[in-house]
Regions:
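A short, glycine/Asx- and small/polar-enriched loop/turn
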Residues: 72, 141-146
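A broad, structure-centric signal for solvent-exposed, well-ordered loop/edge residues
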Residues: 12, 107-109, 137, 146
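Catalytic-core regions of hydrolytic enzymes
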Residues: 2-98, 103, 107
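Short catalytic/ligand-gating loop segments at beta-alpha or beta-beta junctions
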Residues: 54, 58-59, 122-142
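Structural motif
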Residues: 76, 128, 145-146
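Active-site-adjacent substrate-binding region
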Residues: 107-131
């Protein structure tokens, strides 16, 4: 398979960086992208890192990721994020755990998203499941089927 992967948000310290608290989302999602890319390549997949590190706003970061992603002809697009967990160890019961967001259930996205959630949940995180989100540009505007993993 050919796969795009990207860390959501700008790097830490820049505008539009990710959640901070117990973990720093912008740092950790980049670590995950690096490891995920290496694992997928070791399995024989072609992987493109479409992370944006120089966005000037939230919309600019998203637009740059979408442009990089759409420049590649791939089978799947995966955006890596971390739920904020309400910025504490206990969380608020609403944003804690893992979930995958998809635009719709076509192109086998739901099946893959369920597998991602199940595998992350095996690490001890609450499995919040797969959710349809039609309002997120990253899911709407990428040409390839896209999964946003939280």
């Amino acid at each position: 398979m050919k796969i795009n992967v990207h860390a959501g948000h700008n790097p830490t310290g820049k505008v539009a960086c990710g959640a901070v608290g117990l973990l720093d989302e912008s740092t950790e999602n980049r670590n995950v992208v690096k490891e995920l890319k290496a694992i997928l390549e070791a399995e024989g997949h072609i992987v493109y890192d479409c992370t944006c590190n120089n966005g000037t706003s939230v919309s600019d970061v998203i637009n740059k990721i979408v442009a990089k992603s759409n420049a590649n002809t791939v089978d799947l697009d995966i955006s890596i994020h971390f739920n904020s967990g309400a910025n504490d160890k206990i969380g608020n019961g609403k944003s804690c755990g893992t979930e995958c967001l998809i635009y719709n259930t076509s192109n086998n996205k739901e099946v893959i998203a369920k597998r991602i959630c199940a595998n992350i949940a095996q690490l001890g995180f609450k499995n919040r499941g797969v959710k349809i989100r039609t309002d997120l540009s990253i899911l709407k505007e990428t040409k390839a089927p896209c999964i946003l993993a939280e």
